[in-house]
Amino acid sequence: MRFLRFLKIFFTVIRFGLDEMMLSRVNDRRVRLLLRITTIGRKFDQPPGVRLRLALESLGPIFVKFGQVLSTRRDLLRPDIATELAKLQDQVPPFDSAVAIAIIEKSLGAPVDTIFDDFERVPVASASIAQVHFATLKIGQHAGKQVAVKVLRPNMLPVIDSDLALLRDIAVWAERLWADGKRLKPREVVAEFDKYLHDELDLMREAANGSQLRRNFAGLDLLLVPEMYWEYCTANVLVMERMVGVPISQVDTLRVAGVDIPKLAREGVEIFFTQVFRDGFFHADMHPGNIQVSLDPAHFGRYIALDFGIIGALSDFDKNYLAQNFLAFFKRDYHRVATLHLESGWVPATTRVEELESAIRAVCEPYFDRALKDISLGQVLMRLFSTSRRFNVEIQPQLVLLQKTMLNVEGLGRSLDPELDLWKTAKPYLERWMNEQIGAKGWYERLKIEAPQWSKTLPQLPRLIHHVLAQRHDAQQRGINDETIRQILLEQKRTNRLLQGLLMFGVAVGVGAVLARAWLAIAYGGY
């Protein structure tokens, strides 16, 4: 079976001329000679990106998904190919509703007719991973509620694991034979895709993501997120509140209904940056199919978010990297941008900041030939990643996911309002987050969180200092290889951060003690 699947992939590659695209970059002369022979008489009118998209579509939904993930890696692909892959549509015929009902009944342990009224056998939506049916809950505390029932496709795991095994084999060969193999890191891309697919196969995980997003926006008049009905959620079935809205792509319908379109565009950007900088938890699949707008008088003009299979998470370190990079970029302070990359610890310690600064200036300066409102933050981030790749920077998957989502949000906002000023909308969020981190309130909050750990580690400070100095001395004496030195330097940088924190804590404790004693002296007339 696996061999037959491999043959299909092989003949698809030949049919669409992908062998010409890939093997022309192979180092082996014999392979290049074979390529010349096999391409005699073949001519392709369509550009490479179109041929790659058509080939992935012909190979089925798993490869379509792979192409969609690949399209987000604009730090690796040529822009024309990435743009073409972004057109891939995850639309497949629905599976038999009788099979869907059998899965629901097995997962929930009861006949569908006892759980739901008016279960619609024709699915309202169908994709490669699951399909959705509308129904009304019949029992329990939510009886009478209209719901959407998402059902995982049957027997998906064996198919996915088989195709992933083939993709892993192809990635290994590509890395060995292809001149661009090491730069494009095919095994890394396939591993990322593996995680992405298996995350989507767990509907309990998706329900948890949706529940978290709903909780984050509770009390904010910005975004509606469906309630998850946990008693009816399993790994194969997800039952959530049915949301009624107009797809965001139907702009004319929204305008006729009286929705303020420019305001809608601004609020979309506000929702995104609230998720990124306030919560560090963002919906990472914000294409038009997953976004609607409510026309219900109680929630008129509010966004509705659907499908929570892909979620991104950012640490405070990630948020600081983003905020400082964007602020430095718009000040055209390229030295600061380069320094931030080095300080992140993701850049080899041997990198010269001046070289990185020069490369960043070369890709960023042309952006300022246009109005600030026309600058794409997603494109800026993408160009920074592409430049960083040349310096062997460790690309962070969470930031790549953010960059892809940012491009979607920008495209959505500008399709609603071509005059949308993304920087003007985003800047207050960046500055507010920076002020909260640097200001007294932010310092106090971090102190409350870190103080217990620091109090345990502070007595170890002399030993840590001795350990750092000994590491550097040993490295110089033993003449160890560059990679080991790089790892030691990275570890040293992390240790230095800890030492700085400990010293700050020690100073804070000392100053606090002095002030407390001074206050007692003033209050009680002496020590």
UniProtKB/Swiss-Prot annotation:
- Give the E.C. number(s): 2.7.-.-
Q: Which InterPro entries match?
A: ABC1_dom (IPR004147), Kinase-like_dom_sf (IPR011009), UbiB (IPR010232), UbiB_bact (IPR045308), UbiB_kinase (IPR050154)
Q: Which UniProt keywords apply?
A: ATP-binding, Cell inner membrane, Cell membrane, Kinase, Membrane, Nucleotide-binding, Transferase, Transmembrane, Transmembrane helix, Ubiquinone biosynthesis
Summarize where ATP binds, as residue positions.
124-132, 150
Its record classes its membrane topology as:
Single-pass membrane protein
Active site residues per record: 285
Its UniProt pathway annotation is: Cofactor biosynthesis; ubiquinone biosynthesis [regulation]
Q: Which residues form the Protein kinase domain?
A: 118-501
Pfam families recorded: ABC1
Location of this chain's protein in the cell:
Cell inner membrane
Q: Name one GO cellular component term.
A: plasma membrane
* CDD domains cross-referenced by the UniProt entry: UbiB
> One MF term in GO for this entry?
ATP binding
Q: Which GO terms describe its biological process?
A: regulation of ubiquinone biosynthetic process; ubiquinone biosynthetic process
Q: Give the transmembrane ranges.
A: 502-522
Q: What class of enzyme is it?
A: transferase
Query: Which protein family is named in the record?
Result: Belongs to the ABC1 family. UbiB subfamily.
Protein function? Is probably a protein kinase regulator of UbiI activity which is involved in aerobic coenzyme Q (ubiquinone) biosynthesis.
What protein is this chain from?
A: Probable protein kinase UbiB
